[in-house]
Amino acid sequence: MERLIDNSHGWPGRMVWLLAACLGSAAAFAQTGPAAQAAAAVQRVDGDFIRANAARTPDWPTIGVDYAETRYSRLDQINAANVKDLGLAWSYNLESTRGVEATPVVVDGIMYVSASWSVVHAIDTRTGNRIWTYDPQIDRSTGFKGCCDVVNRGVALWKGKVYVGAWDGRLIALDAATGKEVWHQNTFEGQKGSLTITGAPRVFKGKVIIGKRGAEYGVRGYITAYDAETGERKWRWFSVPGDPSKPFEDESMKRAARTWDPSGKWWEAGGGGTMWDSMTFDAELNTMYVGTGNGSPWSHKVRSPKGGDNLYLASIVALDPDTGKYKWHYQETPGDNWDYTSTQPMILADIKIAGKPRKVILHAPKNGFFFVLDRTNGKFISAKNFVPVNWASGYDKHGKPIGIAAARDGSKPQDAVPGPYGAHNWHPMSFNPQTGLVYLPAQNVPVNLMDDKKWEFNQAGPGKPQSGTGWNTAKFFNAEPPKSKPFGRLLAWDPVAQKAAWSVEHVSPWNGGTLTTAGNVVFQGTADGRLVAYHAATGEKLWEAPTGTGVVAAPSTYMVDGRQYVSVAVGWGGVYGLAARATERQGPGTVYTFVVAGKARMPEFVAQRTGQLLQGVKYDPAKVEAGTMLYVANCVFCHGVPGVDRGGNIPNLGYMDASYIENLPNFVFKGPAMVRGMPDFTGKLSGDDVESLKAFIQGTADAIRPKP
């Protein structure tokens, strides 16, 4: 029987207590057979196809199934009565060991899905066989440039091409039949800082639109639109203003600058607001919507000492998809101070409120409130917290948060509830118009924060979280244990009544996104390695299957040759999954596809047993304190606290064989693990620093070792 790992203390809480290429090398490997079918299938995908498909959803042509990103399928061959009869049709090895966050897209039985390191796979869903694989050959030593694992949330399809945003900033167009590159653009050209792409591109009206992430690293947010056929850049919109001594790009930036205090010189640290995930499109209104990210640095007092809302951080922004021109915005967290991004997936829906039909945006960002907005004009309709929060008591009738002053007092340790991991992170939610419910992966990951009053941009320092790898948060993660408790749950949320209809508790935070169907079913993967089906109206568990590793992505469903299939890409990871896990099953990234009466055998699961605590490494006890500070600045977010965390998709150093720690310089300086994402600390750490790290690692293991 598999033993689940206890997450009752919350990984980040324990962490602080004890204390992230070139075109010529890209490669596609294609097989013959279904390639011609793939070409014909994707050639049909355009705006008309996507809108027509939304009426019946036989295919899953975009990551959210439709432009509204409802993740609702009208298929009902699999339903609440027969979902118990699902069996495996096939499984496909993605050959990855890091996080997999993509939703598979499927047209005419051809699946396209991305895995870690931006690798793209084309799969024949009739057999589960590979058609082709494209590897953009990302420099694996650049994993440190992103906070939250080397993940990719999926691809876009349009008129015979597959588009992927690569980790290193390339937007790449591939031939859907062969996987060969058609064109690429460097979306980071002319920009500064540690920039990465993890989000899926969207294609609206023949333009491929992509953002980037990196607000922890001192960058300025923007999204860019490129011609889907040629790759020509069409427009770019920035989410925060630049240096006010220079001309602003447009009127929206001029207005935004009035909400920032220039004494904070926010532009030197970028200001943040990166748009790294959610985008939707209303063709009738000719409007696209995008969620913006957190401030850079995180601390509001550091970035804008005299206050101000700091537009357009933590906002939903409406843009003209033809020109990128700003239309309106609604800011969900004015003066963001806690990494409360609004990049989380949004849904466009038409619902009745007070008896009247309304065109709305449904959104549950990191800050813990569920928002209903009028998508025609951005007007606030309602907001209600869906988890406990301590930064605001609610929102007034004008849509302004009623703040709690103590939550902004960065002079002393404060529990952030929710914390920077969010009450809801990137894990997609879904909306079922039959039940009227939104199926939302909710969570809490305890974190205790305090402002770093001595913060300076790009100045690494002992004890400053991940500053040695480029973080610029101006916050400390404190040693004081958070009072709040971790949890993960599936919420069925009524957006009209603004209350939960039902909920299911999970063993850990960081569970997968959801899919709901006309068959009255909700599917969700879990951190402890299961794909589960629930009754959409009641939450009753109807079926589950083991997945060999934790699930963070959302499933998709589609019809092929008259049969409905459900597919999910699994691979434990993301920022929480780097150092923690909820199951000892740690299999490779895999696509599982299920069908009624499926008879395929499940692949063998790999048990990653926690080893023995490190012992026998000689160290100087006087170096433990210095090693602690160096570890926090360079190692902790990937490796966790030695011997306390169990390791996620990156090993915990407190359970390594002593020979690894004794020879730590061989791994820290241009070591063999660079090909798996380990940074090179040459020039950043000294030999004496490494001795201090060894002292902290072995010293911590010794301190927590049970006494005989």
Swiss-Prot record:
Ca(2+) binds at E216, N294, D339. Keywords: Calcium, Disulfide bond, Heme, Iron, Metal-binding, Oxidoreductase, Periplasm, PQQ, Signal. It catalyses: 2 oxidized [azurin] + a primary alcohol = 2 reduced [azurin] + an aldehyde + 2 H(+). Optimum pH is 7.7. Residues 619-708 form the Cytochrome c domain. Binds 1 PQQ group per subunit. PQQ is inserted between disulfide Cys-147-Cys-148 and the plane of Trp-276. Binds 1 Ca(2+) ion per subunit. In the crystallographic structures Trp-543 is oxidized to 2'-hydroxytryptophan. Its cofactor is pyrroloquinoline quinone; Ca(2+); heme c. Catalyzes the dye-linked oxidation of primary alcohols to the corresponding aldehydes and the (subsequent) oxidation of the aldehydes to carboxylic acids. Methanol is not a substrate. This is Quinohemoprotein alcohol dehydrogenase. It comes from Comamonas testosteroni. The lineage of its organism: Bacteria, Pseudomonadati, Pseudomonadota, Betaproteobacteria, Burkholderiales. The gene is qheDH.
